[in-house]
C-alpha cells in the first residue's frame, strides 16, 4: 500500500557533468611529464609527519586503492611511488570558472555541486537543441578542445538518474538513461552505488537483506518509512527512478562539515586530537571544492555514554585553511571539561559563509 502518491515527471532533460580526477588532471595537463604516473593531490606525508588528506588522485593512483579523503599516510603506504602535489586551489578555481562559462552557452539553469561537477537542465536551452545527449557531447567536446580536460556525463529525466549515469562510465564516459530503461538500470545496481545513500544506511539496508536495486524494489514503502523516516520515502522512489527535485541555479549551502562515528571508542587524547586534525583537513578540502570559506567553527563530540556536546568559535575573518580550522577545533576540544571520557563520535562543521 502506498502512503504517498508516485509523481514522476518524465519530460525534463537533465545532464550531470563530472570532471575526471579534476585537480590531478589540471596538474597533469600543465606538466605532461606527470602523464601515466600515479599523481596525488595532497600533502606529502614524508614532509608533514604523516598529516594530510588526499584531495583527489589520478586514475593510475586509484588502481592502487587510493581515493579522495583518504589520509595521505595511507595513500603513501598503498602507492609509495606516487607523485604528491600540495595543490593550487586558485588555479583550480580559475579552471572551474572556465568550465562554468562553457555550461552557460547552453543554459542558465545550472546547479553547481562543487568546483568540478554540476547539474544542467537543458529542457529549454539557449540553442534550441532538442537532444540532451547532443548537448552533453558538445559540452564534453568544448571542455576537451578548449581546456584539454575530460569530463563524464550522465543524461536522464531527473538529477538522481543523471548522477548515477555520469558515475557509470568513467573517465570520459557518456551514459543515457531513458524513462523505460530506469528500473532495469537500477535493479542491477549495488545499493552502495545509489547516490545519496550513505555508508550507515547501506549497512542497515544490508541487515534487511537489501543489497541491490532489485532488492530495494521489493520492500514496501511503509517498511522503509518506518525504518528510515523521510529517507525511507526517498529510497522507495529512488528504486523506481523517481526524483523530482529541480535544478536550482541559486542553491546556497549554509554549512559544510564532516563527522565520524568510531566502532572502537577513542580513549587516548592523542588519538582524539589526531582524528580532529584529519576531520579538519577533510572539511577544508570540501570548502575548497565548494569554493566556500567560513567564519564559524563548530566542534561536536559524542561520548561513550551517548551524551553529546557542541562548542563553537567565531573567527575575525573567513577561512578555508586546514591548519587554522584544526587549530580552532583543537582549542575547542581543550576547553571541554570531560576530556577523560571515551569518545564515540567527532564532528567539525564550518558555517558563517
UniProtKB/Swiss-Prot annotation:
Residue runs in coiled coils: none
Protein's UniProt name: DNA polymerase IV
Residue intervals passing through the bilayer: none
Domain of life, source organism: Bacteria
UmuC domain mapped to chain residues: 14-198
Residues the record marks as site: Substrate discrimination: 23
An MF annotation (GO) of this entry: magnesium ion binding
Alphabetical UniProt keywords: Cytoplasm, DNA damage, DNA repair, DNA replication, DNA-binding, DNA-directed DNA polymerase, Magnesium, Metal-binding, Mutator protein, Nucleotidyltransferase, Transferase
Residues of the active site: 117
Subcellular compartments: Cytoplasm
Species the sequence originates in: Streptococcus pneumoniae serotype 4 (strain ATCC BAA-334 / TIGR4)
Binding residues for Mg(2+): 18, 116
Amino acid at each position: 500500500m502506498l502512503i504517498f502518491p508516485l509523481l514522476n515527471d518524465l519530460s525534463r532533460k537533465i545532464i550531470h557533468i563530472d570532471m575526471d580526477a579534476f585537480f590531478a588532471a589540471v596538474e597533469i595537463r600543465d606538466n605532461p611529464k606527470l602523464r601515466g604516473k600515479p599523481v596525488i593531490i595532497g600533502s606529502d606525508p614524508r614532509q608533514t609527519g604523516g598529516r594530510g588528506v588526499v584531495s583527489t588522485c589520478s586514475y593510475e593512483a586509484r588502481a592502487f586503492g587510493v581515493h579522495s579523503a583518504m589520509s595521505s599516510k595511507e595513500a603513501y603506504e598503498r602507492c609509495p611511488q606516487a607523485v604528491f602535489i600540495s595543490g593550487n586551489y586558485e588555479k583550480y578555481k580559475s579552471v572551474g570558472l572556465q568550465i562554468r562559462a562553457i555550461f552557460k552557452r547552453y543554459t542558465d539553469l545550472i546547479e553547481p555541486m562543487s568546483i568540478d561537477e554540476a547539474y544542467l537542465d537543458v529542457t529549454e536551452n539557449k540553442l534550441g537543441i532538442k537532444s540532451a545527449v547532443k548537448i552533453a557531447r558538445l559540452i564534453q567536446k568544448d571542455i576537451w578542445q578548449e581546456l584539454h580536460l575530460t569530463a563524464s556525463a550522465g543524461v536522464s529525466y531527473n538529477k538522481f538518474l543523471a548522477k548515477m549515469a555520469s558515475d557509470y562510465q568513467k573517465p570520459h564516459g557518456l551514459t543515457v538513461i531513458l524513462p523505460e530503461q530506469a528500473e532495469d538500470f537500477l535493479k542491477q545496481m549495488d545499493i552502495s552505488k545509489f547516490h545519496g545513500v550513505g555508508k550507515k544506511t547501506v549497512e542497515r539496508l544490508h541487515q534487511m537483506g537489501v543489497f541491490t536495486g532489485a532488492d530495494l524494489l521489493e520492500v514496501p514503502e511503509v517498511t522503509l518509512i518506518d525504518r528510515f523516516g523521510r529517507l525511507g520515502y526517498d529510497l522507495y522512489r529512488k528504486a523506481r527512478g523517481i526524483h523530482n527535485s529541480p535544478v536550482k541555479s541559486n542553491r546556497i549551502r549554509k554549512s559544510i562539515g564532516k563527522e565520524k562515528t568510531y566502532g572502537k571508542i577513542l580513549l587516548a587524547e592523542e588519538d582524539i586530537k589526531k582524528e580532529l586534525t584529519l576531520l579538519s583537513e577533510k572539511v577544508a578540502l570540501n570548502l575548497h571544492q565548494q569554493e566556500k570559506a567560513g567564519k564559524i567553527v563548530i566542534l561536536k563530540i559524542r561520548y561513550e555514554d551517548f551524551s553529546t556536546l557542541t562548542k563553537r568559535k567565531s573567527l575575525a575573518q573567513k577561512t578555508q585553511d586546514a591548519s587554522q580550522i584544526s587549530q580552532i577545533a583543537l582549542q575547542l576540544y581543550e576547553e571541554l571539561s570531560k576530556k577523560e571520557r571515551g569518545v564515540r563520535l567527532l564532528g567539525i562543521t564550518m558555517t558563517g559563509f
